[in-house]
Amino acid sequence: MEPAFFEIRGGITAPKGFRASAVRSGIKEGLADKNDLGLVISDFPAVAAATFTTNKIKAAPVRVSAAHLRAGDTRAIVANSGNANACTGSTGIQNAKRMAQAVARQLGLKDRQVLVCSTGRIGRNLPIEKIEMAVPALVARLSSEGSEVVARAIMTSDTFHKEIAVEVPLAGAKIRIGGIAKGAGMINPDMATMLCFITTDAAISKRELQKLTSASVEQSFNCVTVDGDMSTNDTTICIANGQAAIPAMEPGHESYDKFAEALNFVTQQLARMIIEDGEGVTKFVEVHVKGAATYQDARKAAEAVSNSILVKCAWYGEDPNWGRIMDAVGYSSAQVREEMIDIFFDGVVATLHGLPSSTPEDTLKEVLRNRKFTVTIDLHLGSAEYKVFTTDLTPEYVKFNMGE
């Protein structure tokens, strides 16, 4: 049986009709060898979908991109690292608009066809003149093999670049989806200090692309947490240009379902890369709450455990302190009954019916010595479940974030 999709090389430039580039504009002072400005374009008309931070304090590029997205078609994304252009008032809005305008003029596009993203330190005005001066070189370097350089250009505290691409075989044709992302610290459900750009040569309406993108983000980036902090800048953008030469995908069609499955794989893999690159992380933990009365209860309990400082510290110390997990479940506001809760570490029972199991502590500690493990919490109140991917909390994380 032919697989629904398979991984290929090329990242965001793997789909037909996309190019990308990166240059050093000088935003990151003192880093002469670090690119800090990236560009992704579709050489053909395209539609876009996006999700933005739910933080009430939204950065200027988030506000400008949301407005541009509503205005119609999208052809390009320009992004900088080293400066968030957040909490910069009306000057920040104007600078974000100038950033889009500089790229639009160089490419012969309308301003609204360019989306802008920024990541970096909050509260500093964007050195827009440096960006404007760098745009001609940025456009000149556009390449169908430019995915990795953009992925590296948007990195901040990341330790490795994050990219992926897949090919989806269809009857007599194929479509491709590519993606890049950045993120390591300040990661929390509902998007946070995370940028993700996805491209596809599939043909799909803007409405359906938004529906699938939103659903995919909910199942991936909104299920990861490193430190519980939510950023002002996070953005996921998906651009589709229809160059795969297949009919437009619609709900109920096999191509639509295969595309949705492949898109979910792309976002989930990028989300896992982000969590594994968490600042100072030594443990990668999947928290799986099942048996909840409702989906919201499962989510509340999973997120409470995943964001608990005490739980995360215990994981760093390789201590199977299930009491801290019980405590977090209890204050999560999810419906629970203490005497019905079971807790497992990689399938090894730690708590049975709310009481200590007979499993030797050394056996549980052996599980926590692994870099990756799963904590399963069964509430035995229903059939709803939810998963969150999280990490431990280390002295290295504290040291890294003592100053910027």
Residue spans for each PLM region:
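A structural signal for small-residue-enriched, beta-sheet-centric alpha/beta enzyme cores
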Residues: 1-80, 84-94, 104-404
